[in-house]
Amino acid sequence: MGCKTSKMCCPQLRKKKRQKAHQGGLTSQELNDLNAKTQGPNEVLQKIKEYEQEIRDLLQKHQEEKTALADAHKADVEARTLELQAQAQKDRDAETAKLLSEQAATMKAEMEEKFAELQKSFEQEKVSLTQTHQQFTDALQETVDELNSQLASFREKMKRVEESVLRQDYRRHIQDHGSPGQFWEQELQSLHFVIEMKSELIREQDKRLRNHESTMERNLVLEERSRTLQQENEALKVQTQKQGAVTVRLSEELLSTQVSLEKQIHRCEQLQREKEQNLYRAVNGDAPQQFSLQSNAQELPVMVL
């Protein structure tokens, strides 16, 4: 039985050996030597074991080379990923710095423009107040001049009282009818003087009252303008505070958006790495291969090639 089995197996073995010799590039002399050495069943089994060991060695070597290539590829991918992440972070930082610089320049320009407007308004108000002060000074000077003029006029009128028509009539009456007495004469003169003075004072008070009313009207107008300017200044302050709050809120939103963007980029990079790892596992496989003579014999030509 053993001999019959050996005769049946030998042609197949010799055929496989010739195929292996042809695929591996063996010479005809080596093929003849191999055929001469595999005549017996024990020698055939021994040779099969040697071939199996060679196949294991080849598979192990191939696995080691594949692992080394995978490690090198992984290291290259990680280095490239780190480089891209660093470049992306650098670009993001540059873009953020540029955006913040543009916002700062815009805010500075707006603040300078508003400051220029406030400065212009202040200068105009200063000129207006200076003019108003000058007008008040001129009005007071006119009042002083007018009072001096009134005083001079009053003195002149005192002189004219003595020479007035009533005094002349009074003297004529004394000449015609006699003197009523020194006491009554003095009383009449005093009464006449008081009447003249009261009339003059009434006229002066009426004029002063009209001037005072005009001054009060001007003061009311100036107070109204002052209140309006104060309200405008308060409105500008509130608007400036609101714009500052909006600027702070926009800065916070920008930082929050930047953090979210960085998280999203990190998540995308992580998903990309997981995708590459899954693809690598799907192509190469992670589990160690079980040695099978039939499967390894079928894969041998592919590996040798």
Curated annotation (Swiss-Prot):
Lipid moiety-binding residues (N-myristoyl glycine): 2
Transmembrane segments: none
Any Gene Ontology CC annotation: midbody
Compartment list: Cytoplasm, Cytoskeleton, Spindle; Midbody
Biological role stated in the UniProt entry: May act as a scaffold to regulate the recruitment and assembly of spindle midzone components.
Xref: PANTHER family: COILED-COIL DOMAIN-CONTAINING PROTEIN 69 (PTHR24200:SF6), TOUCAN, ISOFORM A (PTHR24200)
Protein's name according to its UniProt entry: Coiled-coil domain-containing protein 69-A
Lineage, opening ranks: Eukaryota, Metazoa, Chordata, Craniata, Vertebrata
